[in-house]
Design a protein with these regions (language model features):
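ATP-binding N-lobe of GHMP and related small-molecule kinases
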Residues: 1-96, 114-123
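A cytosolic small-molecule/anion-sensing beta-strand core signal
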Residues: 7, 140-141
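DPxDG-like acidic metal-binding loop motif
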Residues: 96-122, 138-140
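Short, well-structured alpha-helical segments that form the helix of a local strand-helix-strand
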Residues: 121-132
């Protein structure tokens, strides 16, 4: 399965207040832009999640949002992981504030939902995505 994961920009970002957990409540206006990574998800026989990218310095383990998305998807749905490989062709600039990792995670959640016919709603995918990062729910929509 091939999926595009689109970058997003913040057009406006206002800090509302600081929460007890140290994070801030924000009011943001965001917009998707026409820069995307190409994600390919396919089955493998390893019974594990494997990941590869075209950028050697990106993590291929739990430090990668796409990997986390797959792991959390299988936990949340109780679907046994038959083994999947995620290939990411990064075209969204890394660490540029364009939500590239979050977008990749959202694409993996949506792709696995379709692949495994899990039937999760967009709302549920967004809830799962929030466990990965604050931008993932936006990217799911």
């Amino acid at each position: 399965m091939k999926i595009k994961s689109y970058a997003k920009i913040n057009l406006s970002l206002d800090v509302i207040n600081r929460r007890d957990d140290g994070y801030h409540n924000l009011k943001m206006i965001m917009h998707s832009v026409n820069i995307s990574d190409d994600i390919e998800i396919r089955m493998n026989k390893s019974k594990k999640i494997t990941i590869a990218t075209n950028l050697k310095y990106l993590p291929n383990n739990k430090k990668n949002h796409a990997y986390c998305a797959a792991e959390i998807f299988f936990e949340e749905t109780k679907i046994k992981n038959p083994g999947i490989h995620i290939n990411i062709l990064k075209k969204i600039p890394v660490c540029a504030g364009l939500a590239g990792g979050s977008s990749d995670a959202a694409a993996v959640l949506k792709g696995l939902n379709e692949m495994f016919k899990a039937g999760l709603s967009v709302k549920k995918l967004a809830e799962i995505g929030l466990k990965i990062g604050a931008d993932v729910p936006y990217c799911v929509h």
